[in-house]
């Protein structure tokens, strides 16, 4: 499911810039995030029921971009509403299972969060015209 094929009320996304816990190597971080943390969320029904989609985007290595200030990965969590996000982090299972696991591999104090609304699509594939704020594109390029 993507934004373009989602029907219904606008979704919210929690985008988190993640940094690994000091002393943990990049590969250890990636392995724990992929093989332990993600499956832990997915296999906990009282958490999984609140979230529409959970994406893990590990940092590309070698990273040619500077200025990312040690970000090791980006987590994107899709929710139907802010209320669903609040319910997700309020679940006892989150406090008992997920929060302690996060401390095993994340630098909790260095995480940066952004909660976003429905996106404005500027480009939707090669050569595709996307509607902007003024309506459908005419195919002209600026």
Predicted features along the sequence, with ranges:
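Macromolecular interaction modules
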Residues: 6-142
């Amino acid at each position: 499911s993507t934004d373009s094929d989602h029907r219904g009320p606008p979704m919210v996304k929690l985008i988190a810039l993640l940094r690994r816990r000091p002393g943990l190597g990049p590969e250890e971080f990636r392995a724990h995030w992929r093989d332990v943390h993600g499956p832990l969320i997915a296999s906990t029904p009282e958490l999984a029921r609140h979230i529409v989609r959970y994406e893990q985007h590990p940092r590309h290595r070698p990273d040619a971009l500077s200025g990312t200030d040690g970000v090791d990965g980006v987590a994107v969590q899709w929710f139907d509403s802010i209320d669903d996000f609040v319910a997700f982090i309020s679940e006892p299972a989150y406090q008992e299972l997920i929060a302690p696991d996060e401390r095993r591999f994340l630098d909790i104090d260095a995480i940066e969060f952004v909660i976003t609304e429905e996106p404005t699509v500027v480009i939707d594939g090669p050569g595709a015209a996307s509607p902007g704020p003024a309506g459908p594109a005419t195919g002209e390029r600026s």
